[in-house]
Structures are given as C-alpha cells and as structure tokens.
C-alpha cells in the first residue's frame, strides 16, 4: 500500500484479488483481527466449534445492526469495514465460527476470540484486545508482573481446541493489542505437533513478554513464525520485551492514536 494507506484503502484497492492470485498477508490478518472486535454475542450460530457449521462472512455482515458495534476501546465503528470486506472477492468466501466471550471477575480474565476458515484451506484464530471493562484493564496490568495471566492460558487452549477441529488446515494466529500478545503466547505454548502446522502468528502492536520468556527454548522454537508490527509512535507494542523481528509501519494518526488499527 502507499504511505498512510488504511485497511479500508486496502480492501478497495486489493479486494478484487482472491487468495489464489495473491496469497494471505499481514494486512489480511489485520482486517480479520479488526472484525474480531465486533460484538457477535447475540449470534448463537457463530459460537459453534464445528467448522462444518461455520457461517459465511457476508451472511454475518448482513445481519449486523448498531447494537453490534465493536467491544474494544476505539471510538470507531468497525461494522463498515466488515461490510466492505464481505463485498470483496477476497473475503466473501471466508467463514466464521468459534466465537467466544469469557469474562471472570474472580480470575480477572477477559477473553474474546473468533476463528476464520480461509479460502486457501487454512485456519486463522483471532484474539480480541482489551475491552472497556475493569477486569480487562486489570488483566493488562497483571501481564506486566505475572508469568502468565488467565487469558494467555485460555488462548493456548482455545487454539488447540479449534485447530483439533480442523486437522487438515494450516494454522495462523493473530490479534491486535492484547490480542496480539495472546496470539504470540498461544504460538509459543501449543503442543509441538501443532506448532509444526503453524504458518504464522501475528502480533499487531501488542505487548511482548518477560526476559525469561523471550530467552526460553519454547520461544526460540517458534520465533521465526512470530511477526510483530508496530506503528512509528508505538506505546503498547514496545511494552515488555520482543526478541523476534518486527516491522515499523506508517499510520495516518499521531501519537497514542496510532494504536488504532484502522489507521
């Protein structure tokens, strides 16, 4: 994309190219990670973990209303992005399943995820970032000094569960903000046979890990599959440590607002 192009621009410019002509890339991951912020809680059919019952992305987009606006911290509405994606040749055959919203005040856990079956016969597991709840913020704070928080542990278990339901598909994992950290955590902690199926894990401006984690054998085992993207003025994405390669990208926003994935 040109300098300061957004994901909406990407859909308009490249949406006519199916994955068979131009393979899945990091911007496709970001598009689907942004969609994972939308409030799908009233869509019971998306909660199935059976991939044969997955719902086409355009069908879900057609049912969205104002009450389904995204659950994250952004003031933007992500529904127009999903509707635009649903109209493109590139995304219209994507299917969705495995939506879950898990909130536990006692465990101090906020966990949201949804999975996508892609037309290239791969699977993308996508984790949402922090919502507006106090528990979500407390869990973010806990990440700075606990070796693991409940959402991280749940992310690895969720990935294993969803991947087991799709044994013939290559695996991708992604997320934005805390969701990006969860994606990397899951990649590091899933069983070795599943790591062999892992094509990539995308951390979009999410925190890193403790020094002990990035210096561990578990981390090194998948380090070449971890892809981290941060904006020029990243704040969240430079928290804690990253030992994997990362790319600095342009943003149409300034300062902390560069954390907004639509920019």
Regions found by a protein language model. Give the residues of each.
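Short glycine-enriched nucleophile-adjacent loop
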Residues: 183-192
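Gly/Ala-rich beta-loop-alpha elbow adjacent to hydrolase catalytic centers
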Residues: 174-179, 183
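Alpha/beta hydrolase fold serine-hydrolase catalytic domain that processes acyl esters and thioesters
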Residues: 1-26, 34-44, 51-113, 118-123, ...
């Amino acid at each position: 994309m040109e300098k300061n192009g957004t994901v909406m621009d990407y859909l308009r410019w490249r949406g006519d190219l199916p994955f068979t002509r131009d393979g899945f890339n990091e911007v496709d991951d970001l598009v689907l990670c942004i969609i994972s912020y939308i409030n799908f809680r009233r869509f019971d059919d998306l909660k199935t973990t059976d991939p044969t019952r997955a719902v086409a992305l355009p069908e879900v987009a057609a049912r969205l209303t104002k009450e389904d606006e995204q659950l994250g911290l952004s003031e933007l509405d992500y529904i127009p992005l999903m509707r635009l994606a649903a109209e493109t040749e590139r995304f219209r055959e994507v299917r969705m399943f495995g939506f879950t919203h898990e909130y536990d005040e006692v465990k101090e856990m906020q966990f949201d995820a949804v999975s996508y079956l892609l037309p290239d016969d791969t699977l993308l597991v996508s984790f949402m970032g922090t919502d507006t709840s106090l528990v979500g913020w407390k869990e973010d704070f806990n990440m700075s000094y606990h070796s693991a928080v409940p959402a991280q542990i749940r992310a690895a278990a969720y990935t294993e569960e969803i991947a087991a339901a799709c044994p013939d598909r290559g695996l991708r994992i992604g997320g934005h903000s805390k969701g990006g950290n969860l994606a990397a955590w899951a990649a590091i902690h899933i069983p070795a046979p599943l790591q062999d199926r892992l094509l990539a894990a995308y951390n979009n401006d999410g925190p890193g890990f403790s020094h002990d984690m990035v210096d561990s054998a578990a981390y090194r085992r998948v380090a070449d599959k971890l892809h981290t993207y941060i904006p020029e003025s990243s704040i969240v994405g430079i928290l804690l440590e990253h030992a994997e390669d990362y790319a600095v990208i342009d943003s149409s926003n300034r300062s902390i607002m560069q954390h907004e994935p639509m920019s």
